[in-house]
Amino acid sequence: MRGMGNMQGMMKQMQKMQKEMAKAQADLEAQEFTGTAGGGMVTVKAIGKRVITDVVINEEVVDPEDIEMLQDLVLAATNDVLKQIEDTTSQTMGKFTQGLNLPGM
């Protein structure tokens, strides 16, 4: 019977961890991130759900003769914001799996 109490304690601990993980995930999804390129000439904002919420392009980089440069800056700023989301998500969610020897984690 002693093992049953231990099992119940583990189950409660797992349920608590699941709630904490769900809250952390919800907080991450709502968090706003900002990516930039060209020294701030292009800014892309996104939320943790990986949804782009805003793109700001400084008019100084709008050159009809060099659309490719503008495209590169938008792409770089977008990749910057997505990397920030990925890194923050890995760091935050990794706290929950650290120390657990779970396959695939």
From Swiss-Prot:
Transmembrane segments: none
Domain of life according to the entry: Bacteria
Keyword Aminoacyl-tRNA synthetase: no
Disordered: annotated span: 1-23
Low complexity compositional bias, start-end: 1-16
Molecular function as annotated in GO: DNA binding
A GO cellular-component term linked to this record: bacterial nucleoid
InterPro entries found in the cross-reference section: YbaB-like_sf, YbaB/EbfC
Location relative to the cell: Cytoplasm, Nucleoid
Keywords for this protein: Cytoplasm, DNA-binding
UniProt family annotation: Belongs to the YbaB/EbfC family.
Function summary: Binds to DNA and alters its conformation. May be involved in regulation of gene expression, nucleoid organization and DNA protection.
PANTHER family: NUCLEOID-ASSOCIATED PROTEIN YBAB
Assembly: Homodimer.
Protein name: Nucleoid-associated protein lin2851
